[in-house]
Design a protein with these regions (language model features):
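N-terminal Rossmann-like dinucleotide-binding module
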Residues: 3-91, 250
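A structured beta-alpha segment of the ubiquitous adenosine-cofactor-binding alpha/beta core
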Residues: 91-119
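Beta-strand-loop-alpha-helix segment that lines the small-molecule cofactor/substrate pocket
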Residues: 122-123, 127-178, 192
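Predominantly a Rossmann-like dinucleotide-binding segment in NAD(P)-dependent oxidoreductases
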Residues: 28-36, 47-50, 164-172, 176-273, ...
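Glycine-centered tight beta-turn/hairpin loop motif at sheet-sheet or coil-to-beta transitions
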Residues: 286-290, 313-314
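C-terminal helical cap and adjacent loop that interface with cofactors, partners, or active-site loops
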Residues: 35, 54, 241, 245-258, ...
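Short, solvent-exposed loop/turn and secondary-structure capping segments
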Residues: 35-40, 55, 86-90, 128-132, ...
Length: 387
């Protein structure tokens, strides 16, 4: 049948003795993909090497558990060819396997020696790159958020459904879903021990991460790709690029998506791009449940990155629970207590190898990104926006 044909078309994974070799391509060779220009001084330094470094670390952790697997980086793509070449050199791949330009991702992904693709470009490109990877039989790590607008969300959901048909794994960069503290709270909620969520608030209030200047005579395309973090067209605004983490926790814990949102937003302090400084919105999840969503990128202000929920039995953060009389509620569960940026890749590798649950987070992350898009549009326009 079609499933058998899809499996037959997938590249066979390499072996080194009894060790499975997972061959990886990276599309987007900046800080999130490969740790930027940072070079490791020891194996313990791989945590500073972006998603690819985390994938390599994850394989090493699984080896300690008796799952014999290693990661081999084989191809790199970036809009800026010099970034792809630098990443290839850093990770020991041939210079010929580094590709630049807007279509370099095709050359990096569509190779018989690639099993998994790490997608860490600006958000605008995530749906197209994910769909291309899935169409070519590759497993995917897609950094959050995964779109900047409704058409991108729909394409990401379609790619996720195609991946499910092909039994291809997708893990997104919503690492809180792989973090022990959050998993303990989610488990207790699902078991009814913490009651039903009645409302809450989620926050990402922090500084402007960075701004890239424009060179003389630099093209719009080059400048946008370089300074993407500050342009809504590339990033979806910081509510999609950053605050999506916290919105995703609300969706995950509540177990459904909001029906509508109204919001306000401001821009007064940004020195680059076209994004807002901050957003504040009210997500209506139905059944009387409202979540306040607040995010801000303004330096030298009171910062807060957290989640808060009130149930009929407890007061919750993302990782803890207290009774209404403010006594700690013990949380129990057998979840690994390691860096969640590594654990998400451990879970991806186990899904690929059939050593753990099959994971396909594409649609869930697309829907959380859609919530960010909704709130952004509500703030930009002053209108109520429905899912």
């Amino acid at each position: 049948g079609s499933l058998a044909a899809a499996v037959a078309a997938m590249p066979a994974m390499a072996q080194e003795g009894d060790v499975r070799v997972i061959r990886a391509a990276v599309v987007g060779c900046g800080g999130r993909g490969v740790g930027g220009g940072y070079k490791p001084k020891s194996e313990q330094d791989y945590y500073r090497m972006g998603a690819l470094g985390n994938l390599i670390q994850a394989a090493a952790e699984l080896a300690k558990q008796g799952i014999k697997v290693k990661v081999q980086p084989v191809a790199f793509a970036d809009y800026f060819l010099e970034k792809a070449k630098a990443a290839a050199e850093k990770f020991g791949a041939p210079a010929a396997n580094a590709f630049g330009g807007a279509n370099g991702y095709k050359q990096a992904i569509d190779r018989p020696d690639v099993d998994v693709v790490i997608l860490t470009t600006p958000l605008n490109f995530r749906p197209r790159h994910t769909m291309f990877a899935v169409q070519h039989g590759k497993h995917v790590f897609a950094e959050k958020g995964v779109a900047v607008d409704a058409p991108g969300v729909r394409e990401m959901i379609a790619a996720s459904k195609l991946a499910a048909e092909k039994k291809l794994s997708i893990v997104c960069g919503t690492q809180r879903r792989h973090q022990r503290g959050y998993l303990l709270v989610k488990k207790a909620l699902d078991e009814g021990k913490l009651g039903t969520i009645l409302g809450g608030a989620v926050y990402w209030n922090g500084d402007v991460p960075w701004v890239a200047g424009r060179n003389k005579d630099e093209s719009n395309a080059s400048y946008l790709c370089k300074n993407w973090l500050n342009f809504t067209e590339l990033s979806g605004d910081h509510i999609c690029e950053q605050h999506v983490h916290n919105i995703d926790v609300a969706n995950w814990f509540i177990g459904r998506y909001p029906k509508t949102v109204v919001a306000v937003g401001t821009r007064a302090r940004r020195v680059s791009g076209n994004q807002y400084d901050g957003f504040s919105g009210d997500f209506d999840y139905g059944e009387g449940v409202h979540i306040h969503s607040m995010c801000r990128q303004v330096n030298a202000c009171a910062n807060n990155v957290s989640e808060f929920f009130r149930t009929d039995k407890a007061i919750l953060t993302g990782t803890s629970a207290k009774s209404l009389d403010k006594k700690w509620i013990p949380l129990e569960g057998d979840f690994i207590d390691l860096n969640p940026y590594v654990v998400e890749h451990m879970d991806l590798l186990k899904s690929i190898l059939g050593k753990g649950p099959y994971l396909n987070e594409g649609e869930a992350c697309a829907m959380s990104t859609a919530c960010g898009v909704m709130l952004r549009i509500a703030a930009y326009t002053g209108q109520m926006v429905a899912m």
